[in-house]
């Protein structure tokens, strides 16, 4: 994930979803959302997180028992057969930088409790 954020040049725009994540977690801690509401990762997302996702240093904000894993889904017409595939974040950001209409969706997942949230989206700058 560091590569995508620190690389210089007109590669990617970034949409960060940290505030949305904070709002969900705040509502969970206040009792407005249940654990079932927020720990709802699809089985395919859980599988992708286990086998493709990269473990990061942050722990899960819900269960605090597992470290989060991040993975990327990249969508672009230019990608043809690779459109919508799961990638590591660095691979996904590199693909998005190569394709002008690409969007790289970065998702954080806890494989312990099924918490998942869209973390950020990298957008090819020509697509903005």
What are these regions (language model features)?
Residues 96-128:
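Short, compact, well-ordered microdomains
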